[in-house]
Design a protein with these regions (language model features):
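Short amphipathic coiled-coil heptad-repeat segments
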Residues: 1-19, 179-197
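A short, polar/charged loop/turn motif at coil->beta-strand junctions and beta-hairpin connectors
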Residues: 3, 19-22, 43-46
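Non-catalytic DNA-recognition/assembly elements of restriction-modification systems
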Residues: 6, 10-35, 149
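DNA target-recognition domains and sequence-specific DNA-contacting regions of bacterial/archaeal
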Residues: 26-154
Length: 197
């Protein structure tokens, strides 16, 4: 409902924000291709290599390197550009959360904007526009020009911030609930072990 504009925020003074504009992704973001890291992978490296496995697992599966070949900065959106037919990783995105920690691998792109990346990541990740490139038969490879043509709905910066703040708050609640659930599952596991010893 948010991106269909059925739910809208108001300005602090109670006024309506202006209508959203439709723009191409290339009008809002700078695009960068990643670089090959296969020859510099190091088990004890100090930088995280952002590859498709990293993004598709929300950052839990990691490879490391000691060479910062393509440095990423906080608020960069990284997106998977290649996947198997009917794969679940194509156009999946990850928001970079700190500087000097991540380096961008090939077949992953970096989308950088001066606008609110937290707002846009929810609109870009697994966008239907990108999913239509998957024909279910051969590997899907998104090209730079195709990515830059993706249509985006763009509210004014003040409304972007309100939306991003709301979504970030919800993400925080979800994170805390997952931690609570994990604690309950551990408690249950411990009780079951004690019951059947």
């Amino acid at each position: 409902k948010l991106f269909s504009q059925k739910v809208r925020f108001k300005a602090d003074d109670g006024d309506q924000f202006p209508e959203w504009e439709e723009k191409k992704l290339g009008e809002v973001f700078e695009f960068y291709n990643g670089k090959a890291h296969e020859n510099v992978i190091s088990e004890n490296g100090k930088y995280v290599v952002v590859n498709s496995k990293f993004i598709s697992t929300d950052g839990t599966v990691r490879k490391y390197t000691n060479e910062m070949i393509f440095p990423l900065i906080k608020k960069d959106i990284v997106m998977v550009m290649s996947d198997v037919p009917n794969g679940k990783a194509i156009s999946k995105c990850f928001l970079i959360n700190e500087n000097n920690k991540y380096t961008l691998n090939q077949r992953i792109c970096c989308l950088r904007t001066k606008e609110n990346a937290v707002f846009y990541i929810n609109q870009i990740s697994r966008n239907k526009y990108f999913l239509k490139f998957d024909d279910g038969v051969k590997q899907t490879n998104l090209r730079k020009n195709d990515i830059l043509q993706c249509p985006l709905l763009c509210p004014c910066l003040a409304e972007q911030q309100k939306i991003a703040d709301c979504l970030s708050s919800l993400d925080e609640v979800i994170k805390k609930q997952k931690a609570t659930l994990a604690a309950w599952e551990e408690l249950k596991k411990g009780l079951l072990q004690q019951m059947f010893v």
